[in-house]
Amino acid sequence: MINVLLVDDYPIMQQLLRDILQRYPDICVVGVAQNGEEAVLQSMKLKPTVVIIDINLPTISGMEATRLIKLQRPSTVVLGLTAGVPDQTVTAMRNAGAAAVLSKGDLLSALYPTIIEAMRSSAKPAFASASASPKH
């Protein structure tokens, strides 16, 4: 089961994300946060597999919240959401620890495949190092 924390300051976007994700039986939305500060706290409390976070949030930006989440729980996969920002902001979000940044306009077709791909990508280094270790 992929446990997901949704972070967006607009309830309508939260509901849209829920509606998209509830179509997939391997996804469980475990919580919702409305700002960056709540995102960091909920991530520590709920320990989601994936955090889907808007880049532009009140209190703490999505970028800063991503950095803090990854600092506290490096195994968490973070996906950024944007309504359209400059490339340098997307790059900065990736540098903060986001596995990917999605356009809100592409959520219906891209959200689930991006979650799966980001999880596969994040598992590769751990799997490779674990398989290279000798068994005792």
Regions found by a protein language model. Give the residues of each.
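The feature encodes the CheY-like receiver
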Residues: 13, 58
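Short hydrophobic/Thr-rich beta-strand motif most characteristic of the beta2 strand and flanking loop
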Residues: 26-34, 42
